[in-house]
Amino acid sequence: DPRGEVGMRYLTGRKLTDETMHHFGLGYAGKNGEQVVQYLRKKGFTDEEIKDSGLAMFSEQRGLRSQFWNRVMFPIQDINHRVIGFGGRVMGDGEPKYLNSPETMIFDKRRNLYGLNFARTARTGNIILCEGYMDVIAMHQAGFTQAVASLGTAFTVEQANLLHRYAENI
């Protein structure tokens, strides 16, 4: 899709393989902030459900619009491989550079780690704590499948407890 070229250029520029991009479910949210909302409405979701999911926000001027646009998208999965939120990296000069889904009933970034669903199955007894999404993905592609990252700038006690549940060495 030509609309996703900017995202694909970024990911291939970071030397990610198609296999790695597929494994992590990476994608691109286009510049039109209404596409996701329109798609979800067609699938039968109500505006309230879309807003509560954290994928969109309501503004008086624009109505219900996607939270993420012109961003490479990183699905955030729980330990059972269920998507519970998203991270998005802006393409270009926009701010913020990285944006996570807001806290929802199913997404609490303090209690989750990016990549833990894959690191847990590595069963190495070790976990490598990285700074962010791209670090985790690059480490996995290089064969270090026990890499994880916190979701945001703070590393929490809950995340430390998670690490200790799944690894002897950090």
What do the predicted segments below correspond to?
Residues 30-168:
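Phosphate-handling DNA/RNA-contact segment within nucleic-acid enzymes
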Residues 15-26, 45-52:
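Short, surface-exposed acidic
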Residues 1-3, 28-32:
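Short acidic alpha-helix initiation/capping motifs at coil-to-helix transition points
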Residues 1-22:
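Non-catalytic interaction/clamp surfaces of large macromolecular machines
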